[in-house]
Amino acid sequence: LSSSSAASDVYKRQVMNYIKYLADARLINMVYPKGEEFPKKPSKLMMHNTNLMYSIYPVKVEEQDVLDTFFMNTLYKDHKLYKGDKGTSFMVDNGLHFRICAEGCKFKNNPNVYYALHKLELGHGNMIPLWLFGFLY
């Protein structure tokens, strides 16, 4: 690669185009902060679904990444997901804040945030079992 800024800019655009092709092929999802979109750099790249995570590199699959991917995969068809603010995982549509929590996750209950909790059987208040989102798929 050339060290000139023009060549560097072309390279960045090519990489972003390749990432967009992967997203269009439904292999990855790009998560942006509210108000940003392609061709800007996404704040987070995620596999499109959890099966792809285990097929590409099954040795190092983090539980939190699996939970986040599951949540995003169940909602992305009908909703727009953005990077969440501090203390949240995602912002859905225009203001529903969700935090995805693994079993045993410690958090202060914020009434403005919905908590999707792994291994919770029955929901109450703003705490929703993560498995229920699977019915949206």
Segments (PLM) and residue ranges:
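Short, well-ordered alpha-helix to beta-strand connector turns
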Residues: 7, 94, 110-112
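Long, low-complexity, charge-rich intrinsically disordered regions
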Residues: 100-137
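Accessory nucleic acid-recognition modules appended to NTPase machines
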Residues: 4-87
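A short, terminal or domain-edge coil/loop segment
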Residues: 83-91, 130-137
